[in-house]
Amino acid sequence: MSQKIDHQKPNIVLIMTDQQRADTIAELGHPWMQTPNLDRLVKQGTSFTNCFVTSPVCVSSRASVFLGAYPHTTNVYTNFETWQPNWVSWLAQAGYHCVNIGKMHINPYDAKGGFHQRFFVENKDRPLFLEDHERALYDEWDKALKARGLEKPSRYTRVRDDRDAFLKNLGCFTWETDDDMHPDNFVGDTAVWWLEDRKASSPFFLQIGFPGPHPPYDPTDEFLAIYKDTEFPHRAASQQELAQQPKMHQQLRQSMVDFNIDSVAWRENLTDEDIQRLHRYYAANVSMIDQKVGQIMDCLDKQGHLDNTIVIFCSDHADALGEHGHIQKWTMYDCVTRVPLVFWAPDRVKQQQQCDDLVQLMDIAPTILQFAGIDPPSNWEALAMNKMLTSGCWDEQDPNEKLRDHVYAELGRDHIQSGA
C-alpha cells in the first residue's frame, strides 16, 4: 500500500443512509418516488443497479465497507462486535482531512476510527442509557435537543403518550417536534455547516451518515404530504407464502411481533393498506434525505469544491417493508440485500451510466483509495470499480471479464434471530 500526499487530489464525500431500499430513486425506474437530487446524481454519474451488501445488518455491513472484507474475515457478524475502520487513517496519512458527520456504527460508538473529527449521531430511537450501561451513549443530536429543551421522540415517549396508537402504527409516526431537529435534517444541516465553516485547502474525506430511513419511519408533515395519494406497487404477502417459509423466518417474524424493535410494533396478517402506509412514511423519509443531499451539493458548489469532488451515495442495507411478511433486515431477500449505489464526479466518472453488473457494497473501499492515489491491499476481498466508472461496465467491454460473477452475504446469530 503506497501513499503520496498531493493537495490536488479530489475531495471525497461518502453519503451513506441507513436501511434504504434499491427501489427508492425515481431515475432508476421507480416513478412513485420523488427524489430530484438523487436523480441528478444518477443522470450525471454512474449507478449500480445490482449492488449487494455483505451482511443484512448495519454494523457488519459497515465493517465490511471500512475494512474491505467479508464478515468471516472481519469477524464482525452482528451489530454487537467491536470494530474500527482501517483505511480512513490511510487517507489521513495521504493528506486528507477526514470527518464523520452522522451515523457510522463504529463500536465503541465514540472511537476515533481514523477520523480527525467526528460529529456522530447514532441513537435515533434509543434512550439515554444509564452511565453504568456498557453501551452508554450521548451523541451530538442528544446534545442539540437538550440545548433546545426538547424531549427526543422514541418508542418510550410514544408508548407513554398513547400506547394503543403505538401498537397499531407499524413504526409509522409523524415527526413530533421542531423540523430542523429531525435526525436526518440535523445531520444534513451539520454537514452544510461544516463545509461552510471550513477554511483549510487540503483535500477532505467527508463521510455523512443519515440515520434514516431506518425506523421509526418518522417524516415531517411536509414530506408525508407529498405521498398522500401515491400508490406503491407493493402488496401484502399471502398466507401460503408465509406458511411455506422456513422455521427460522417464522420465528424472526414472531420476534418482530414480540419485541417492537426500533418502534415497529409488527403484526402478522398485514393488509395491502398496511403495506401502502409503510411505504408512504418510508418514502417521505427518503425524500427528506434527498432534499439534504441537494443542499449539500449546492454548498459544495458555493464553496468552490464541486469541480474537484467525488460524491458517492449508498446505504448499508435495505428494508423488507412488509415484503414476504417481514420488516426491517436480518433476511437474505433481494429487497433487503440490494441497495442503491451511485458515483458522481463529472470529470472522473462516466455520466448517464446505469451498470447492471454485480458489485458488493464493500467494493467502494478500494475504489475510494484508488481515487485518492492509494494502492489498496492485495489481500482485500473488496474489488476496485474504477475501471467500470471511467471506461464503462463490463457488458460494454468484455462480457467475459466481469468484476464479480456472484455476490455473497452472511450474518451471525443474535438475540433477534432466535431460530437461526
Residue ranges with predicted function:
Residues 1-420:
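Formylglycine-dependent sulfatase
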